[in-house]
Amino acid sequence: MKKLSKRMAALSTKIEDRIYAPLEALSIIKENANAKFDETIEAHIRLGIDPKYTDQQLRTTVVLPHGTGQSIKIAVITSGENVSKAKAAGADLFGEEDLVESINKGNMEFDLLIATPDMMPKVAKLGRVLGPRGLMPNPKAGTVTNDIANAIKEFKAGKLEFRADKAGIVHVRFGKASFTKEALFDNLKTLQESIDKNKPSGAKGKYWKTFYVTSTMGPSVQLDINAVQDYQPEG
């Protein structure tokens, strides 16, 4: 078992073995995020689904009201005049078969891959490279589209794709330690609503299992999911 560093051990003593109210949990996470850089705040949510069944898979996108605080590199595989449109819209990498070949050779210098439908037969051949990294374009995720410019704009502005992994756990980066706890909660609430809205049709029993938040270099804190779901803004 890996031994905790002195810093992590000290931070862990500030966290009680209980479920926390959302804003209290976020306050603790922010307080513990004292590294020499602006730590990323993450959510790790275990759902009552078994993704090996197609009707229990979760993969979708959400636009967080305060963005993620991160800049992402977007690659676009398209053809014809759409290549210049991708460049004009701010894509970091763009091309046709040349980009397909580059990726196939190991060029993975991007965080998100968008493709137009006409290029998907060629992109499909990259499944071995893209699949394990969760980068294969998908219509449900908004990454297979003819509206390249709008897709790039939305993802650059904070739209993000998330999915449940093989264990039914959703991992999402939803802000930075420099965000206010209220902004972090707004993002978290939006994420919760998206997960509920996109509940797989085959999900059985208890849908929400556990809900933890953490920072890049800090310990995790368990959230009260009911308090997140039941929250109603004043007025």
Curated annotation (Swiss-Prot):
Alphabetized Gene3D superfamilies for the sequence: 3.30.190.20, 3.40.50.790
Keywords: Repressor, Ribonucleoprotein, Ribosomal protein, RNA-binding, rRNA-binding, Translation regulation, tRNA-binding
One cellular component (GO) term of this entry: large ribosomal subunit
Single GO MF annotation: structural constituent of ribosome
CDD domains: Ribosomal_L1
UniProt key word Methyltransferase: no
Keyword check for RNA-binding: yes
Job description of the protein: Binds directly to 23S rRNA. The L1 stalk is quite mobile in the ribosome, and is involved in E site tRNA release.
Family: Belongs to the universal ribosomal protein uL1 family.
Designated name of the protein: Large ribosomal subunit protein uL1
